[in-house]
Regions:
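Basic nucleic-acid-binding interfaces
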Residues: 2-15, 20-104
């Protein structure tokens, strides 16, 4: 068995974006359960409806995509985006102080 060297192109990140209805009590429960399931599976909240998870390999990413698909409630929209570690490293996060300046 050969060991493949880890690099920024084999390590993956998963983003889960969602817009779930929360009008009824059942919808609120389903949305909260979806979030809890994401967190139990190792996802971290990046923004309120955006969760992110590090995956050490492409195979690991595939496993977590299947899990997310199993968590999806019957209503709403859920999107999954996978990016390499190299691509993830190019994310630009704008500090709050900069966004506040643009509002003045």
């Amino acid at each position: 068995m050969t060991l493949e060297r880890l690099n920024a192109y084999h390590i993956m990140w998963l983003f889960v974006f969602f817009d779930l209805p929360v009008t009824t009590k059942k919808e609120r429960h389903d949305a909260m359960q979806f979030r809890k399931n994401l967190e139990k599976d190792g996802f971290l909240m990046m923004q309120f409806s955006v969760y992110v998870r590090h995956c050490g390999s492409y195979e690991s990413m595939e496993v977590h995509i299947k899990r997310v698909k199993a968590f999806v409630p019957t209503a709403g929209l859920v999107s999954i985006l996978s990016v390499t570690d190299k691509q993830y490293g190019n994310i630009t996060t704008v500090p709050l102080k900069w966004t506040n300046r643009s509002l003045k």
